[in-house]
């Protein structure tokens, strides 16, 4: 077992409650993920986004494979080592789960989950927000070819 995986870079959450102005008025930028690791090269792929919208006590969960544009007006923006999920908030609040996969330089694949729940006030601003982050989990280890015995 290769324990160097534990030193891998991972993503942290930046909770941003910025409402974009102008053309995109009313879209709240929330959340943002950032690489805070040790600089090891890795690539990130947001695999799945689940949006559970609270609409008058009816829970609607929609899962989309990212990157995506859908009826909620959601999209992803990458800036350097940050990935922003731009989510158009429902007037009732709701819950969003991002399933993020990343791959290290040795092609091991890790998965990390970020869950957000939020309430939106009458001015369409986030009035309360809570989030959970799971530790990166190894989901696929590079297959080592052990045929060559010398």
Give residue spans per PLM region.
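An amphipathic alpha-helical interaction surface
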Residues: 20, 38, 42-150
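Membrane-proximal alpha-helical anchors
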Residues: 1-42, 47-50
């Amino acid at each position: 077992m290769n324990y160097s995986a534990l030193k891998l870079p991972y993503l942290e959450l930046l909770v941003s409650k910025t409402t974009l102005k102008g053309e995109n008025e009313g879209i709240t930028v929330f959340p943002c993920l950032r690489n805070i690791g040790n600089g090891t090269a890795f690539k990130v792929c947001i695999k799945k986004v689940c949006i559970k919208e609270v609409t008058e006590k009816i829970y609607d969960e929609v899962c989309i494979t990212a990157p995506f544009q859908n009826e909620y007006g959601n999209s992803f923006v990458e800036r350097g080592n940050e990935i922003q999920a731009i989510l158009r908030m429902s007037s009732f609040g709701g819950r969003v789960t991002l399933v993020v996969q990343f791959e290290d330089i040795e092609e091991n694949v890790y998965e990390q989950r970020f869950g957000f729940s939020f309430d939106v006030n009458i001015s369409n601003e986030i009035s309360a927000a809570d989030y959970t982050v799971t530790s990166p989990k190894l989901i696929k280890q590079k297959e080592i070819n052990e045929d060559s015995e010398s």
